């Protein structure tokens, strides 16, 4: 892993206070400050008013020789007339503002308002502009960038924003979680298949013995480490209690390779399985049973028979948009393994960065892993997502995994029975790779033209005009160039070499394949020539050509390909016949209303499917519409109850409420939709969560968006056939409520205290509020929490009134927070008038 920490280059010049606010401080400062404000909605159809207030904080008039840059989630910007300061997009989510000929020098202390229109209304604070910096120009030379102080004004009337959590609906929803019985010893996450109590108990007090054959040495070592670190139990040769890891004598019991038995009696804990993976799963169950206990640890005699329903249970982590260090990713791997998840989808490349060292293609990290101020991207990419303007700074915008880092990650994950599936985003979402290979071309073009063009991914003569979903105009690889396939095979072979050195098998590489914009390739001479040569009639034929070529390259290298759902859509039957046999997994993500049938259509067509449903498993979707909840919302809101609600074999019944929190008619939701056939059912391999990083600014934010909502993913991957799935009407609702209540009890009683003890960040839910007959009622989904509230409009804190029972309330506004495990939730507001 590389974090760049070189000092910021010195200023090119600072000849006047107005250029860099030089003043009396040794540290140069920008001569301006900014205040951003969201204006009126629907200034014109599809556009919303925004404004910056630009203030001259220097001691001299502000001339016309400057540009201010900033980042913001992608959107169109436009202005009416001839503004004094122009605001425009540079590319994607990177913008700039600069004075026009209409600009008159701004006197010291004076301010001016810069108004512009944006597509997309901003209804959460994490979508506001950020990363503002100033660059001045003199005699054709730029100064070094300087940060600009940005004050973001609160969104107007946040409680009236669409999606703002309704305190009364939350209260009513929480009522279904009442009257839950006490947890049993085996009530863990994910739930075990079968548990049987017995007479007696075992007590673990300070020391424990551990017996195992050589085949389970790794599992024994990891168990020993966890017993010591988490519970203070020392493993010794002889102790009153022995934990035995054994091979299953009746291997016919093993439903699959991850099956295990766990038996506890008076002096022995026995974990039996047919494979090391099964043994590992059994050790995680034992460790989970200890979570809610105190030393000395008493475990009642019992037996467990357990196995997963789905053999693929994964989580995708995006380290491209914003960087997660290898140590933090290992922390996640350890946590995922504790919940018996078994795949890490390693999203290391995208438009905004390339994060893995590839020998022979050094530009991928020398250029593609760094973001900072640049006018030509010859040494770094443009800033974005608040990654900063300094390409050498230790920010979330900069960094990559060295070859050694990645090999270490592979070994670490493999010991914990987690496969790492790398993803090379292609042909779309490939801007970082495209820019990096342009830099390589420019480096060699004057000395070795053949070497310069060897891995080029773009055609200089291409005049295609397009905009991706993220508003990039240059992020798609040219699929007609032989150098494209040399590049892809080079990366694949280098990846395979890393896996070999790690001693870890590589079966597939994920090739991306999603969100290729309309209009790509149409202006490419090479693509037009290829279309003519191959008798192609439409642009999709080029996409089909790319994926079939890549499938052959993968097969030539002993691998199968994986990709997002687009890799299996719209092809000729001939292409389908080829791809079905060469696919390891098609990751179906777009299940928004109107598109949700695609998942089962792909499975019915013979492709192996991984369910990645945006409405249930996109962890980067905000928990709800509160303006201070980070995340996106294009696919809905996802919290721990929504992930728990997902039904792999009844996906149309997987979203129980709409965006406003109103109940959905589940019977109507599935009516007339594509039915999963018996063959299609066999093609559902598993489930996966996605965590894209556009709104993440720290590892703390990674954990916040994962926990607790990832618990629903872990549960549903292990137990894919919940009891309520086959029920209907009131019986179905009652069974679901009972299961959900138990799930929340496990999270609040077992998981949240564990996370708090072990430095894992997590989110607390809002309390629900109701004012009825002049009294304030409150509740919360988790047990053991405090609800504190105010009635004067102020923000609740740890000293605010504690709600314990209905209290008289005639205030026009009530604000409340949940407090638990040293944390507090975001405040929720209930207006009673």
Language-model region placement:
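Short beta-strand elements of extracellular/lumenal beta-sandwich folds
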Residues: 33-61
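Feature activates predominantly on carbohydrate-active enzymes
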Residues: 257-475, 481-508, 688-689
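Flexible, acidic glycine-rich loops studded with aromatic residues
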Residues: 560-568, 573-769
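Short, compositionally stereotyped local motifs that mark structural "simplifiers"
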Residues: 20, 211, 730-833
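Acidic, contiguous N-terminal accessory segments
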Residues: 23-27, 128-308, 562-569, 760-766
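Intrinsically disordered, low-complexity Pro/Gly/Ser/Thr-rich segments with frequent PxxP/GP/PP motifs
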Residues: 82-122, 554
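Active-site neighborhood of glycoside hydrolase catalytic domains
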Residues: 468-583, 591-595, 599-601
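Short acidic, flexible loop segments centered on an aromatic residue
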Residues: 42, 60-91, 132
